[in-house]
Design a protein with these regions (language model features):
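HKD (HxKxxxxD) catalytic microenvironment of the phospholipase D
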Residues: 26-102, 106
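Preference for short coil/turn "hinge" residues that link or interrupt alpha-helices
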Residues: 11, 17-20, 81, 90, ...
Length: 127
């Protein structure tokens, strides 16, 4: 499947025959800004990119932005863990896009996990 985390998605997920394997979530938390991390592929074939902007018309054609690959394997795994895995596992501040375009509170299972809280804890431990 495909997991997307963002606040302005121009996609309808879970549409039969089109996007049934796509899930879109939005995290409404302490921080307004979100990471611009793009991953393509799986496991050892995964390519990780960082960007200064989201991929919208206004950013791609009217501004100077940068998007670059993370070539260091260790760093790419860390970015994937902190940005993608962490945010897709958020089950307290996540909202999920429905096929009709509306959002509903995501009801995750297991121990409560807040992506932004976990990230702050991890980064302050290493400060």
């Amino acid at each position: 499947g495909v997991g997307l985390v963002g606040s302005e998605m121009c996609i309808r997920d879970r549409v039969k025959g089109v996007s049934e394997n796509i899930r879109v979530r939005s995290i409404v938390g302490r921080f307004l800004e979100h990471m611009r991390v793009y991953c393509f592929g799986v496991d050892d074939e995964r390519e990780v990119y960082l960007s200064s902007a989201d991929w919208m018309d206004r950013n791609l054609f009217r501004r100077v932005e940068a998007c670059f690959p993370v070539r260091d394997v260790v760093l790419a795994k860390r970015v994937y863990r902190e940005a993608i895995t962490n945010y897709l596992n958020d089950n307290t501040q996540a909202w999920e896009l429905t096929s009709d375009g509306s959002y509903r509170k995501f009801k995750g299972r297991g121990k409560p996990h807040t992506a932004q809280g976990a990230l702050m804890m991890e980064l302050t431990e290493h400060a």
